[in-house]
Each structure stands twice: as structure tokens, then as C-alpha cells.
From Swiss-Prot:
The keyword Coiled coil applies. GO terms for molecular function: GTPase activator activity; zinc ion binding. Residues 414-423, 434-444, 573-588 have a biased composition (Basic and acidic residues). Keywords: Cell membrane, Cell projection, Coiled coil, Cytoplasm, GTPase activation, Membrane, Metal-binding, Zinc, Zinc-finger. GO terms for biological process: negative regulation of small GTPase mediated signal transduction; signal transduction. Its main location: cytoplasm. Transmembrane segments: none annotated. Residues 103-132, 363-485 form a coiled coil. It comes from Xenopus laevis. This is Rho GTPase-activating protein 45. Rho-GAP domain is able to regulate RhoGTPase activity, actin cytoskeleton and cell spreading. However N-terminally BAR domain plays an autoinhibitory role. The record marks 766 as: Arginine finger. Residues 1-99, 414-444, 564-595, 981-1036 are annotated as: Disordered.
Length: 1107
């Protein structure tokens, strides 16, 4: 019975199926094959395993990546037969991006389509249950074809050799090899489907990023020259076998991958297999105990270190920050903060490991493991005891049977001899012998029956032991798998926590290192000396002092003293005094002095005031201003000069930012009036909380770290900054309708900055920006909106932000409903020639080809269905791309290249299934064709009728818009559209001075100075309405005869009071026809009067504002 059971075990489905798909020849008889012939190697099965121990203890290389672990296969060693490339491709530099020829794109997309077909075929073969015995070799063959095609693509384009791609490939290989083709298991099907979808999505995203020039260099496999174990050749080369190579993935899966069946069969066949499994389970429990003890003690050490580090930081934090203006003080302050945060992170991670992720699950699993192991062991020992009892009874029965048989044989012999000797003896003796023989026979038969019963019982117990053995081995395997699962999740969580805990350290140390390199020697000492604000040391004079009587003879008489003492007289070393000035000083000391109650204002360079009439004021009256007064004076001076000269910069830059003026500030940070942070807030630059060493703006309430002021990109809007706006991934219409021109401000700002600085930059929109800077720019746009300052941002980062915004729209700029029509139109345009490239797109005017012209007309009709805001934005964006393509000789960005980049960003199919996204890559040439057509035939597709009003006011409106946006310091907001025309204004009649009433005297500010010859005139002016602080009404201007009054006084030598009066500094010129600078122009400023609560100006070239 035992032998029959053994034969049944040998004929299990797994072994029979494996033998039917087994190796056709031993490994030594295999001929050497090239690495590219991977389909035959994948289709073939491994050679017969004669030593399961050796195959079960395979050692992987130390440089094994996570894709090999996921695949469950060993990679070939450097001494293997796999082909090695001559050089290892290195990731591209940050400044140069990958370029691919337009001709190669179609070939690449063809390979992608074939790869998608191989994956579809592999899925059909694996899921087809009708194939039965041929499913395994066919699946291996399909997998080999897909991997061979994938390797060819990666060899041709090394930038596709990413960790994610190889990880997905390794996972797919392991799922195909470990699939149970004999029995349909739902878990295997789900795992296989998930691996297939992951492979398709990963390869699709990698191809998309490669075509758009956005391959992240951090995901590339940068291999040392001697280590090729993480390449695609190693992944496929390890599968093809050969001399000196490790066993293939198929061998590994069949020898150690079929954990469910092969391991049990091996242990069932081997002597002492259950004892070995129980011993392994016992050792595993001990291993879990030692491992948890190690992690616990290590966690305790880290907690002690964290507590000691926090204690050290708290002890020295106040000491190091006590003195100001010390070298590297900000660096070490940041380092202390990082150490404090690191200590908090260590304590948090330790508590998490103790109670959630590692120690508690491992200890609970170890206890359960021990309990189950003892139960299984008791079950096995109980079955063994039953078999031993049956075998003992069998031995006793066999001995009794032999003894009774021998006695029966002896009795039978005695009875036979008694019959022969019957003549010599009596019948009584013969009967006695016969009865003895009969009793011996009965006892022998009874012993034989007992013996047979014991044999049957022993066989039964043996069979039960075999059944218990199978059950015990299965339970032990499940127990070990469960423990492995818990240990794997705990290990992953542990090292992920360690990574999250230690990852910020190198970044922080690198930041501190780079900041330390920027320190200039003696910088803080110089800052310390400058902030002292020390008064000049007074000159000490040693002069003769005459004796003064102590007794005053008359209380009404006292000595007359000079207004200035000897210390107030400037020394000859600092100031040379002419003889005339000394005479004036002596007269001022002895003679009569005239005291005034107001200060005398003297303008430098005033020709009407000579140096002789200027009194020599003592130096004590010229003390330097305090830092705050100096800052205010500089700010007022700068504002005055800009207002007088009519200059309005694109960015308001303050001269000082309070207590943070001595650190390096970005251009946007200089626009804020900063003070020390009073309450904890969230930093608008790094999006983390600010507790200490923070700054906030007095006007817009922006909060920021002190270290983040160097990179701040949000300008001051002179009003409270709004909360964070969800910008990326938001519906396009919601963002577009917030702008007056229905174009999102992000698109307009990025495009304007790129057109200003990067139209001739090589590879614009193709070279990838730095990922961290791009994320910071996106965050700045969401925090600051239109106030983001982009003059210091890299153009490649700006292009990345623009593409990222377009790609993350829930519905693309060209809606889903137009996608099929556009793709059909593109396919129709490419179907014209034999090569599949279609006619060349070229705008020849009236001589344009008929086919091309029909495509353009159909495209124009399709775009008529776009919503207004989508069409406006698309037109604006395509116009910008036209300007970029006009510089093709310098930036290498032709319309076709721009189509490749912006095709997937402007249009995409409606999302359905993951595998469809891989097939949609075939539409890339069609998307690029549509965008290329839009760029080349922009004037035809987006042509609009131009009215006379638009011609007359278009330029002025755009100029007014730019001027209004650049004048941020006046705090003026636009209330109406700048292109709107203002109504007519009727200028009232100015009254005669004699006829002015009391009311007019109280309301007119100097109106009596206006000549009575001015007449009312009706003027029509295209004025822009502005929301002022004092009044929102429109300001008329005065023309005609009043202007001649200013022209008649142009030749007078006396300067206009408006040039020196700060009350006139807001009278700013709005026309730019004067080519002479304002400070050289001798034209007097026009008169400005206020009557009846309104401002009247005598020239349309001036626009006053209240400040």
C-alpha cells in the first residue's frame, strides 16, 4: 500500500506536466547560443534537477536591484556568457537634453506597437484554458519575444533603461514562470494581470517622457563599467543559459519557485524530511526572536542618541544665538534646527517601530509561529507513535505466528510417527497425539490471523502517517510563508522608515555646505561695524581759556556767548574754509544773528544761490541719520525720482527690508516690508511651518523662513495675500474665466518670460528642467498667483511648468470630444504617400498644395467647436510656438519638434483602460501632425476680421495694460477693461477772481490763479479709468489756450517749483514722445488745479495720481 502511495505521489500533475514540458537534452549537450536568441531559451525548460539542495541555495550577486528581487530570478554573474556592451550609457547632463530625429520616431512607435501586440498575445495565451498542455511553452515563447523586442529598444535608446522598466519586466517574468497552468487559480490570474498592466503602463510612461524630453535622470541605471548585472542584457542573458552562467529563471522557478508542490515532494521523498522542516521552523522562531532583540536594542540606542542630541541642541541654541553678527551664525542655527528635527524624527520612528510596524508584529508572529509549530509537531509525533505501536504489534504477532507454526509442525510430526508406530502402542496414545496436533494447528491458525491483522493495521498506520506527513508539510510551509510575509512587510516598513528618517540629512548637509561656500571673509564683522551707527568722534581742541570771575557784579548783566562753541567749529583737516567764509563766521560769532523759525531749504546746484550767501553750518548739525530714517529717506528719494522722471519699473524693489536687510535677498523678497515673525505660520516658499527665525511682510502678511528669503519668488501685492489656490489638476474653465482675457495667468506669465529671455535658447521645451526647482515654481504659482517673480527662474524650468500644467488638466485644452475627429484628420493627411509620412506641411500662400489646404480647412472647422476660453488660450499658445519656430536655426525647435512636445499635452484620448494607454502611443505622430499644422498655418486657422477700432486702440491698450501692471507701488487696481473708451467730458467755465463766492473759495485750491480767458471746450479723450484711493471718477484735462500759457514761460530762467516740490512728484508724464531725459528737459510741468472736488490738468500728456 505504501508503494502504491509512493507511485501516486510520483505521478502528481505538477511532476507530469513538468516532465512533459521538460528539457529535451542535458545541459552539457546544449550548444552555445547567442543572447539575442531568447525566445528558444525561454520556451525551453530547465534540465533535470539531480541535487535539489544546490538549486535551493542559490546566491545572488551583491549588486542585485529590486527588479531582480521582484522577478525572483538570479542575474548572471560578470563571468557569464551574456553579451556586454562596450560602454555603459550615462545619464544626460542637466544642461543638455536628449534629442531624437523625427525619422526615428515612427520606427520607435512601431516597436512600441509590436511590443503591445506581444503583451496582448501573452495575456491571451496565459488565460486560454483550452490549450492545456501547450500553454506553458507558448507563454514562454510569447514572453521571450516581448523581452527580446524590449531589449532591442533599450539597446537603441539607453535612456529607456530605467529602474521602473526593469522592475516591471522582472515582475512579469516571475508571474509567468510561477503561473499554475494546470489549475486555474484566481490569485495567480490577478497577479499576472497586475504585472502585465504594470509593465504596459511603466513602458508607456517611459516612452512618453522620452519623446517629450522629460526623462528623469534619477531613475536611470548609472552602472559602473564592470557591473552589468542591472541591465536588460543581464535580465535576458541570465535566461538564455550557457557555460559558466548561473541557472536560468526557468530552472530557478522550477527548482525553488514552485514552493507549493516541489518542496513538499522533495521532503516527502527524503528521509527525515518532516524533521528537517520542523527544525527549520524552530530555527526560524529563534531567528525572529534574535532579530526583534537586535532591532529593539538598536532602537533604544537611537532613542538615547536622539534625546542626547536634543539636549545638546537646547543647551547650545541660546548660547550660539546670543551674540549677533557672528560668522556662519545662520548656518549653525539652521544646523541646530535640523538636528532638533532629526531628533524628533528618530523618536517618532522608534515609537512607530516599537508599537506598530516592526517589534509588535514580529513578536506576535513569533508567538503564533511557536504555537502552531508545536501543534504540528505534536500531530506528527502522535502519528509516529501509532505507527510504532502497530509495528511493535506486528513484530509480536510475527514471533507468535512463527512459534505456533513451529509447534504445529512438531505436533504434526509426532502424530505421524504415532500412526506409524500404532502396531506397537495402544490407541490411547495415538488419540492423545492427534489431539495435541489439533490444538497446535488451531493455535497456529489463530497466530496467523493475528499476524495478518497486525500487518493490515501496520499498513493502515503507515498510510495514515503518509497522509499526516503531507498535511504536516503543507501546514509547515503555510506557517513559514505567513512568517515570511510578516517579516517581509516589517522589514520593508523598517527600512522605509529608516530611509524617510535619514533622507533629509544629505540634502540638508549639502545645502549648508553650499551656503558656507558663499560666505565672504569678514562679512559679518563689516555688517557689525556698519550697524553701529557711530557718530564721528568729536575733535578735541586744547585752547586757552581765560579766567572768568566767580562773583557776578550785577544780576542783570551776563556775558554774551557765541551761538557756536569751539567744538562746533570744523577743523582744518576735514574742511577748508575760504577767507570770505571765515569772515562770515566771525561776524556770525560776534555780531547780530537772525533766527528763523523754519529751516532754510537750499537746492544743490541752484544757480540763483551763490556759495557766499550760504552760512557755514557746524558739523554737529550734519549728523548721519539712523538706519530707519536712512531707509525711509532712500525710499522716498527713489519714489520721488521715479515719479518725477515718469519711470515705472516692472518690479518694485525696496531699498531695505527691516531686520533682514543684511542677508542675501531675492529680487521678489526686496519688494516686501519685512519684520520678525510674531506667531507661527506656514512658509509660502517651502510650504512648511515657521516657528523661529521667520519673517513676515507688514503689508501682505506673507510668512517665510529666514533662509527661504534668498529664493523667495512671490512679490508683495500691498494687500493681504490670499490662501493657497489649487491650480494644477483643476478644471481649465474655472481658472481661465478668472482672468480678464480668459487666458490663465500661469500660461501668460510663463510664455511672456520665455519670449523675453529664451526664444533663441537651444532645446527650449525639449531640455528637461531640474525637478526640485520645477516643484518649487509650481508651489510658488499656487501660493502667490500673479505675484510670482520669474526673472531669476531657469527657462527650462518655466517650460516644464507650462507643460506640466497642460498635462495635468482633467480635460485637455482640446476636449475629448474632438480627439477622434482630429486623429482621423491626421491619419487622412498621412495616408497620402507610400512612405506614410504624408505631404510636407508648408505654407506657400496661394500655391499651397490642395491636399494640405483641405486638411487645414477641415482642421479650422473642427476648432470652431472649441469653447471661447479654450480657443483664446490655444490661439495665444500657438502664436507663441510660431515665434519659437521662427528661431529654428538657433533653438533647433522646428514645428515638427514642437508638435512632438506639445501634442500629448494639448490633446489625449478619454481615459479608459491601462492597456489602451499603451496602444495610444501609436497616436503620437498624429498628435504631432495636428500641432505642426496649427503652427505652420496659424494665420489661416486663427484669422479674425480686424476692425478699425481694434487697429486704433490695440497697441495703446496693450501698452496701458503693461504700464498699469508695472506700477505696483501706486497700489492701483484696474476696474474696467483697458480697451474701453471713456465718454465725453465737458470742462466747466472757470470763474473770474472777482466773482468767486464763498463756496468757490472754500472748494477751489488756488483756482483764482487761473486766467479768466479760458473758455469751456468739449474734448473727447481715450482715457483709461483707474481706481484711485481718493476718487474713482475720471480726470479731465485742459487743452487749448491754457497750454499756451505754459509754452510762453518755457524760455524763462526761473525753474519750475514742481521740480523741487515733493507735492508735485505725483504729476507723472504718460507720453513717451520726449526723447530727452526728464532731468535735462527744461519744459515746465503743466498747471494742475482742483475745483469743486475735481482735478483739472492743462495737458493730456500728464496724469496725476494721489499718493
Amino acid at each position: 500500500m505504501f508503494s502504491r502511495k509512493k507511485r501516486e505521489l510520483m505521478k502528481t500533475p505538477s511532476l507530469s506536466k513538468k516532465s512533459r514540458a521538460g528539457s529535451p537534452a542535458p545541459q552539457n549537450d546544449l550548444t552555445r547560443k547567442d543572447v539575442t536568441d531568447s525566445s528558444n531559451d525561454l520556451a525551453s525548460s530547465p534540465p533535470s534537477n539531480s541535487s535539489p539542495v544546490s538549486s535551493g541555495t542559490l546566491k545572488r550577486p551583491s549588486s542585485l536591484s529590486r527588479h531582480a528581487s521582484a522577478a525572483g530570478i538570479p542575474l548572471s554573474s560578470p563571468r557569464g556568457k551574456a553579451t556586454k556592451p562596450a560602454s555603459t550609457p550615462s545619464p544626460p547632463e542637466s544642461g543638455e537634453g536628449p534629442f531624437i530625429d523625427v525619422e526615428d520616431i515612427s520606427q520607435l512607435l512601431g516597436d512600441v506597437a509590436r511590443f503591445a501586440e506581444r503583451l496582448e498575445k501573452l495575456r491571451d495565451v496565459v488565460q486560454d484554458e483550452e490549450l492545456k498542455e501547450t500553454r506553458r511553452p507558448l507563454a514562454h515563447e510569447c514572453l521571450g519575444e516581448a523581452l527580446r523586442l524590449l531589449r532591442q529598444v533599450i539597446n537603441k535608446y539607453p535612456l529607456l533603461n530605467t529602474v521602473e522598466t526593469l522592475t516591471a519586466a522582472g515582475t512579469l517574468i516571475s508571474k509567468v514562470k510561477g503561473f499554475h497552468y494546470e489549475s486555474s487559480i484566481e490569485n495567480d490570474k490577478r497577479d499576472f494581470e497586475k504585472a502585465l498592466e504594470s509593465m504596459a503602463v511603466c513602458f508607456s510612461s517611459t516612452i512618453s517622457e522620452f519623446l517629450m524630453g522629460e526623462v528623469d535622470s534619477s531613475t536611470l541605471l548609472s552602472l559602473p563599467p564592470g557591473d552589468q548585472s542591472q541591465s536588460m542584457e543581464s535580465l535576458c542573458g541570465g535566461l538564455s543559459g550557457g557555460e559558466g552562467a548561473l541557472p536560468s529563471a526557468h530552472e530557478y522557478v522550477e527548482a525553488g519557485g514552485h514552493l507549493g508542490e516541489d518542496v513538499d515532494v522533495i521532503l516527502q521523498r527524503s528521509d527525515g524530511g518532516v524533521q528537517a522542516a520542523l527544525l527549520y521552523a524552530k530555527n526560524m522562531a529563534k531567528y525572529l526572536k534574535d532579530l526583534s532583540s537586535y532591532i529593539e536594542k538598536r532602537t533604544i540606542l537611537e532613542m538615547e542618541y536622539a534625546k542626547g542630541l536634543q539636549k545638546l541642541v537646547n543647551a547650545y541654541k541660546g548660547t550660539l544665538n546670543q551674540e549677533t553678527h557672528m560668522p556662519f551664525q545662520s548656518i549653525y542655527s539652521v544646523a541646530l534646527e535640523q538636528d532638533l528635527e532629526h531628533g524628533h524624527g528618530i523618536l517618532h520612528t522608534a515609537l512607530t517601530l516599537q508599537h506598530q510596524t516592526f517589534l509588535q508584529p514580529i513578536n506576535m508572529r513569533r508567538q503564533e509561529h511557536e504555537k502552531r509549530r508545536k501543534e504540528v509537531k505534536e500531530q506528527w509525533q502522535r502519528a509516529q507513535r501509532k505507527l510504532m505501536e502497530a509495528e511493535s504489534n506486528l513484530r509480536k504477532a510475527r514471533q507468535a505466528y512463527m512459534q505456533r507454526s513451529e509447534e504445529h509442525e512438531r505436533a504434526l510430526y509426532n502424530a505421524t510417527r504415532a500412526e506409524e508406530e500404532q502396531s506397537h502402542s495402544g490407541t490411547r496414545s495415538l488419540d492423545k497425539k492427534r489431539r495435541a496436533e489439533e490444538e497446535a494447528k488451531n493455535r497456529a491458525e489463530e497466530a496467523m490471523a493475528t499476524y495478518r491483522t497486525c500487518i493490515a493495521d501496520a499498513k493502515t498506520q503507515k498510510q495514515e502517517l503518509e497522509d499526516v506527513k503531507v498535511n504536516v508539510l503543507r501546514q509547515l510551509q503555510e506557517l513559514i510563508k505567513q512568517s515570511d510575509q510578516i517579516l517581509r512587510s516589517a522589514t520593508i516598513s523598517y527600512y522605509q522608515s529608516m530611509h524617510m528618517q535619514t533622507a533629509p540629512l544629505p540634502v540638508g548637509f549639502q545645502m549648508l555646505c553650499e551656503s558656507s561656500k558663499l560666505y565672504d571673509l569678514g562679512q559679518q564683522y563689516a555688517s557689525y561695524v556698519r550697524q553701529l551707527g557711530a557718530v564721528n568722534e568729536p575733535e578735541t581742541s586744547y585752547d586757552f581759556q581765560p579766567y572768568t570771575p566767580q562773583i557776578t557784579w550785577s544780576p542783570c548783566i551776563r556775558a554774551r556767548k557765541s551761538s557756536f562753541n569751539s567744538q562746533d567749529i570744523p577743523s582744518s583737516e576735514n574742511k577748508e574754509i575760504s577767507g570770505e567764509e571765515r569772515g562770515v563766521e566771525r561776524r556770525g560769532g560776534r555780531g547780530h544773528q537772525v533766527h528763523k523759525s523754519w529751516p532754510t531749504a537750499i537746492t544743490e546746484g541752484d544757480p540763483a544761490v551763490s556759495s557766499a550767501t550760504v552760512p557755514a553750518f557746524p558739523e554737529k548739525l550734519h549728523q548721519p541719520l539712523s538706519p530707519t530714517e536712512n531707509v525711509d529717506q532712500k525710499r522716498l528719494s527713489a519714489s520721488f525720482e521715479q515719479s518725477i522722471n515718469g519711470l515705472s519699473g516692472s518690479l518694485e524693489v525696496q531699498n531695505s527690508t527691516g531686520p533682514f536687510r543684511n542677508i542675501g535677498l531675492s529680487r521678489a523678497a526686496l519688494t516686501h516690508r519685512l519684520r520678525k515673525l510674531r506667531t507661527p505660520s506656514k512658509c509660502r516658499e517651502c510650504n512648511s511651518y515657521v516657528y523661529f527665525q521667520g519673517a513676515e511682510c507688514e503689508e501682505c502678511s506673507l510668512a517665510c523662513h529666514k533662509k527661504c528669503l534668498e529664493t523667495l519668488a512671490i512679490q508683495c501685492g500691498h494687500k493681504k495675500l490670499q490662501g493657497r489656490l489649487l491650480l494644477f489638476g483643476r478644471d481649465f474653465s474655472e481658472t481661465a474665466l478668472r482672468s480678464p482675457d480668459h487666458i490663465p495667468f500661469l500660461i501668460r506669465k510663463c510664455v511672456s518670460e520665455i519670449e523675453e529671455r529664451a526664444l533663441i535658447m537651444k532645446g527650449i521645451y525639449r531640455v528637461n528642467g531640474v525637478k526640485t526647482r520645477v516643484e518649487k515654481l509650481c508651489q510658488a504659482f499656487e501660493n502667490g498667483k500673479e505675484l510670482v517673480e520669474l526673472s531669476q527662474a531657469s527657462p527650462h524650468d518655466l517650460s516644464n511648468v507650462l507643460k506640466l500644467y497642460l498635462r495635468q488638466l482633467p480635460e485637455p485644452l482640446i476636449p475629448f470630444r474632438l480627439y477622434n475627429g482630429l486623429m482621423g484628420l491626421a491619419k487622412e493627411s498621412l495616408r497620402g504617400t507610400e512612405t506614410g509620412k504624408g505631404p510636407r506641411l508648408q505654407d506657400k500662400g496661394p500655391n499651397t498644395e490642395t491636399d494640405v489646404l483641405s486638411i487645414v480647412v477641415q482642421l479650422k472647422e473642427l476648432l470652431q467647436d472649441l469653447p471661447s476660453e479654450n480657443r483664446t488660450t490655444l490661439q495665444y499658445l500657438v502664436k507663441h510656438l510660431c515665434r519659437v519656430s521662427e528661431q529654428e536655426q538657433l533653438n533647433k525647435m522646428s514645428p515638427s519638434n514642437l508638435g512632438i512636445v506639445f501634442g500629448p499635452a494639448l490633446m489625449r484620448p478619454r481615459p479608459t483602460d491601462a492597456t489602451v494607454s499603451l496602444s495610444s502611443l501609436v497616436d503620437y505622430p498624429h498628435q504631432a501632425r495636428i500641432v505642426e499644422t496649427l503652427i505652420i498655418f496659424y494665420s489661416t486657422i486663427f484669422q479674425e476680421p480686424v476692425s478699425n477700432t481694434d487697429i486704433g486702440t490695440g497697441n495703446s491698450s496693450s501698452d496701458d495694460t503693461a504700464s498699469m501692471q508695472s506700477r505696483a507701488r501706486l497700489q492701483v487696481t484696474v476696474e474696467e477693461d483697458l480697451s474701453e473708451l471713456t465718454p465725453e467730458y465737458q470742462i466747466p467755465v472757470f470763474k473770474e477772481p472777482g466773482a468767486s463766492t464763498v463756496e468757490s473759495d472754500s472748494e477751489s485750491d488756488g483756482a483764482e490763479d487761473i486766467p479768466g480767458t479760458w473758455k469751456p471746450q468739449t474734448t473727447r479723450g481715450h482715457l483709461t479709468k483707474e481706481a484711485s484711493v481718493t476718487s474713482a471718477e475720471d480726470i479731465p484735462y485742459i487743452e487749448g489756450e491754457a497750454q499756451s500759457e505754459s509754452e510762453e514761460d518755457r524760455d524763462q530762467t526761473q525753474e519750475n517749483l514742481a521740480e523741487n516740490n515733493t507735492n508735485q512728484s505725483n504729476n507723472v508724464a504718460v507720453n513717451g514722445h520726449c526723447c530727452v531725459p526728464h532731468f535735462h528737459c527744461h519744459t515746465q510741468l503743466p498747471a494742475i488745479r482742483m475745483m469743486h472736488g475735481k482735478i483739472y490738468v492743462s495737458s493730456a500728456d500728464r496724469r496725476p495720481h494721489f499718493v
